[in-house]
């Protein structure tokens, strides 16, 4: 059993060398900011439903006999504004299914944010309690001694988690600070935790900065930078997106030491309430052990808020009030 525990530790260690990859990564991070920081839930004032589907390293084939192996992630989020008394709140719920070879993760998250309007900007605070269920198929792992795996199939473990964050915006500048994995969790599948290394959820701190520059009333440029650290390493994503008439957009991103991304999107309906986007990633570093292309689809539909203090404009042949 020592060999099995050692192999399990090596598997987790190799999967967490790039600490930012311990959680699902999305190329549309600039359009899905509440996933980065819970304080940004409905930060744009819109209740919405968001869907993301990501296929990473498309066409990757593992060296063992099992099919698949490339990461694939499905994401569903619902968020809305709430007005409880005088408290301007926002509520969001997220479901994520992430599959990576023999490992399958399911996340259920609940976000709560408080948006406070100030004289020179807006301050937002947010928390996100969540539950993670992690499944590992030991039958797909290769051991030096195959007898170590006899009788072992899929093992699962569930653990709570907590994220928190704050954001501040003034005019065209917004920045947000966040921290993930405030509750320590070790996914050891009932094995001796002293014999397994590299399987813990590492606490990660994040900074998200966004600026909007208007060339005209129809065209604006929106650069976004996301930096993450676990205090032993730093990774970053940089994106620049051009938006025309709030209707169509195009952009380019660079993910630290990994990939270049091209993004395209378009908003439909008269009020632009339905948005569809596509991201194409091309790996520029360490491409020998993976396929160089990834694809991601983005879909968002804006919904009316559950309750609102805004008085609707009612038009009749004689009155407008």
What role is predicted for each listed range?
Residues 1-6, 19:
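Short, Lys/Arg-enriched, disordered terminal segments
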Residues 9, 17, 317-319:
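Short non-domain terminal segments
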Residues 12-13, 17, 174:
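Hydrophobic core
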Residues 21-321:
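Subset of outer-membrane beta-barrel
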Residues 4-14:
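Sec-dependent N-terminal signal peptides
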